[in-house]
Amino acid sequence: MIFEHALVLSAFLFSIGIYGLITSRNMVRALMCLELILNAVNINLVTFSDFFDRRQLKGNIFSIFVIAVAAAEAAIGPAIVSSIYRNRKSTRINQSNLLNK
């Protein structure tokens, strides 16, 4: 893939993720947008690692760590959302004041 195309794709994914994270009112949608942002970061890491130094795999290895963090977030996030739904009967962000009881 050409360097500029990968950066445009990454910027597009990152923009969609940020827009969705800012405008979403549902926790599940916010988690999905966060995954889009993390995938855009991974594309950037791999692209810059390939473009600047092909012999060292620092960007690729760091993207594997980001994927591991995203996998943990994908496992823990829905569990937290389902727990909030059981207690509050809603997954809307503006209705879940967890500090107030």
Swiss-Prot record:
What is the official name of this protein in its record? Answer: NAD(P)H-quinone oxidoreductase subunit 4L, chloroplastic
Q: Where in the cell is it found?
A: Plastid, Chloroplast thylakoid membrane
**Source domain of life:** Eukaryota
Per the entry, what this protein does is: NDH shuttles electrons from NAD(P)H:plastoquinone, via FMN and iron-sulfur (Fe-S) centers, to quinones in the photosynthetic chain and possibly in a chloroplast respiratory chain. The immediate electron acceptor for the enzyme in this species is believed to be plastoquinone. Couples the redox reaction to proton translocation, and thus conserves the redox energy in a proton gradient.
Matching InterPro entries: NADH_UbQ_OxRdtase_chain4L/K, NUOK/Mnh_C1-like
Give a yes or no for keyword Hydrolase in this entry: no
Major location (coarse): plastid
According to the record's subunit comment, the protein's assembly and interactions are: NDH is composed of at least 16 different subunits, 5 of which are encoded in the nucleus.
GO molecular function terms here?
oxidoreductase activity, acting on NAD(P)H, quinone or similar compound as acceptor; quinone binding
Write down the species. Phaseolus vulgaris (Kidney bean)
Sequence intervals crossing the membrane: 2-22, 32-52, 61-81
Enumerate the Gene Ontology biological process terms: ATP synthesis coupled electron transport; photosynthesis, light reaction
Could you state one GO cellular component term attached to this entry?
Answer: NADH dehydrogenase complex
Ordered alphabetically, the record's keywords are:
Chloroplast, Membrane, NAD, NADP, Plastid, Plastoquinone, Quinone, Thylakoid, Translocase, Transmembrane, Transmembrane helix, Transport
Cite the Gene3D superfamilies for this sequence. Answer: 1.10.287.3510
Pfam families (alphabetical): Oxidored_q2 (PF00420)
**Membrane disposition:** Multi-pass membrane protein
Family statement drawn from the similarity comment of this UniProt entry: Belongs to the complex I subunit 4L family.
* Alphabetical list of NCBIfam families matching this protein: PRK05715.1-2 (NF004320), PRK05715.1-4 (NF004322), PRK05715.1-5 (NF004323)
